[in-house]
Design a protein with these regions (language model features):
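Short N-terminal targeting/anchoring amphipathic segment
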Residues: 10, 72-97, 110-113, 117
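Membrane-proximal helix-turn-helix segments that form the acceptor-binding/catalytic region
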Residues: 103-108, 126-142
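Conserved donor-binding/catalytic core segment of Leloir-type glycosyltransferases
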Residues: 9-11, 180-210
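Donor nucleotide-sugar binding/catalytic pocket of nucleotide-sugar-dependent glycosyltransferases
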Residues: 135-177, 192
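N-terminal subdomain of nucleotide-sugar transferases
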Residues: 1-48, 79, 109
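A short, charged, and often flexible helix/loop element on the N-terminal side
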Residues: 44-74, 90-97
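A short, basic/aromatic alpha-helical/loop segment that forms part
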Residues: 18, 92, 172-175, 196-201
């Protein structure tokens, strides 16, 4: 008996540029498990090609956004997916851009799962325009968050039963042939992310204190 795999349209950021959300998108795109379990189709949501372009506007960006909208619309009509997975932004100008994409998907009758790699909804929810947009943005969708604590950011608009928690991860790298190097020298540790409280800098410093 031929079993049809569910068709999923993944609308997500992939490199370039390289950042957390785009790397997770690349891991999903390259995942044997994901691609063998579902009939997968992909649209790269990224408009910026360099890190310094993220969050900025301009005519070039506007044309890029319009092209992405057309790409998404074309993919939905062609694939006719059972589910659309999208990694949108939660606040600011990038949110307004993604709001248009999400509302277009809803008008096309799509079932939507949003995977958030950032937060900021709670900081904007008391603004009249943003509040109105969030109500329509989150209506009838499922959410994937990176941690339980992040639910506080969206709880005004999304029921807890519509939220799934999936921490970020990286592919397993075999180190079987790497001999551990023991030395009395002071170790050098690289903190490769933003120096922000929400990125875990305080927990990182606490961990270093324990290691000492």
């Amino acid at each position: 008996v031929l079993v049809m795999k569910p068709k999923i349209l993944f609308i997500m950021h992939m490199p370039p540029p390289v950042h957390g959300a785009s790397m997770v998108g690349q891991f999903i795109h390259d995942s044997e498990l994901v691609n063998s379990s579902f009939d997968c189709h992909y649209v790269n949501l990224a408009v910026a090609t360099r890190l310094d372009e993220i969050g900025k506007g301009g005519w070039h960006k506007a044309k890029g956004v319009l092209k992405k909208l057309m790409d998404v619309r074309k993919a939905v009509k062609s694939v006719k997916p059972d589910l659309v997975y999208i990694t949108p932004n939660s606040a600011g100008i990038p949110f307004y851009k993604d709001f248009i994409t999400v509302m277009m998907l809803k008008m096309m009758g799509q079932k939507i799962v949003m995977h958030f790699h950032n937060k900021g909804v709670a900081t904007r929810q008391n603004r009249k325009l943003d509040n109105w947009m969030y109500k329509h943005y989150f209506k009838g969708v499922k959410l994937i968050l990176l941690a339980d604590a992040l639910y506080q950011d969206v709880k005004r608009y999304v029921k807890r039963e519509d939220v799934f928690v999936c921490p970020n991860a990286i592919p397993v790298i075999s180190m079987a042939n790497d001999e551990p190097k023991r030395t009395d020298a002071v170790p050098h540790i690289l903190w490769l992310t933003n120096i922000m409280k929400t990125k875990g800098i305080m927990e990182y410093l606490s961990a270093l204190k324990i290691l000492k």
